Amino acid sequence: MDPRSEVLLRQRHLFATPLLLAGLPADDLLAELPQAQGWSWHAGEQAQLDARFPDRSRFDTRAPTGAWTSAVLFLPKSRELTDYLLASLAARLPGGELFLVGEKRGGIERASKQLAAYGKPRKLDSARHCQLWQVRIEQAPAEPDLHALAQRYSLPLADGELQVVSLPGVFSHGRLDRGSALLLGQLQALPGGHLLDFGCGAGVLGAVLKRRYPASRLTLLDVDAFAVESSRLTLAANGLDGEVIAADGIDGAPRELAAIVSNPPFHQGVHTDYQASERLLQRAAEHLAPGGELRLVANSFLKYPPLIERHLGPCRTLAEGDGFRIYSARRS
């Protein structure tokens, strides 16, 4: 059981009426709280919840409707995303109770101050290195417009500016990260055919791929619902076509790909987690057509070349700079 869920269950008498669990982990919490429904924006956790608790959780960027008398937000990493989620929940709960639970190292003390916009916050419990806070909604806001909260910026490129649309919670929100900047300079001479932007974030790499290889089919994939929606908005802002899908890692990707291009993810909430990246390297060959190429950026200190060569083929370093390296390997 996730420690945040354990903290909630210490106060289970507060959660006997219909409530919404926003950002809930894929554990036994729904079994313990039969009146609860879930709202998830993580495709992997949603798949696990669907398998165990059919029709009790929804995958979306917007709060589901329901006769909730209270809601719990599991604190996400991003402050901007926390603002959006709290406002979304508070808008559905005039006079109701909104709870916030999170790890101390994840910033729950700081985030608890964000509850003050809706009433007087109070700490209910502290255990398992987590805290539980509560506020009664005295000032219910209007439901926030997610797209109005997007940060939009122009990326100057050799073939013209690219418009990027970044929603709260998306990696490197509102700016181009250093790894992707290095990879953008190494997208030449990719095989033609079906291209995949794995871990697409706001869709920068995928949009550049479609602009540079207009005849190629493009798929963008991310585990996060906000990233999926950001990528769709970025493609639309540039008049580009592409399929954007939500999936938990490379196992959810199409097969017979001409190339996989990636700045792979390495965070799960506040924790560093290289599992999705390592699984990409281990399974890329299963999703590439013969002669298909994996091209990715990674921190220089990560020992990826041996893993790439073990599972795919000879690994070349195409570029290095600013603490990152660009690796390339082809399926034989």
UniProtKB/Swiss-Prot annotation:
Enzyme class: transferase
GO CC annotations on file: cytoplasm
Subcellular localization: Cytoplasm
Reaction(s) this enzyme catalyzes, per UniProt: guanosine(1207) in 16S rRNA + S-adenosyl-L-methionine = N(2)-methylguanosine(1207) in 16S rRNA + S-adenosyl-L-homocysteine + H(+)
Pfam families named among the record's database cross-references: MTS, MTS_N
Keyword Methyltransferase recorded: yes
Keywords tagged on the record: Cytoplasm, Methyltransferase, rRNA processing, S-adenosyl-L-methionine, Transferase
Protein function: Specifically methylates the guanine in position 1207 of 16S rRNA in the 30S particle.
Protein family: Belongs to the methyltransferase superfamily. RsmC family.
Name used for this protein in its record: Ribosomal RNA small subunit methyltransferase C
Taxonomic classification: Bacteria, Pseudomonadati, Pseudomonadota, Gammaproteobacteria, Pseudomonadales
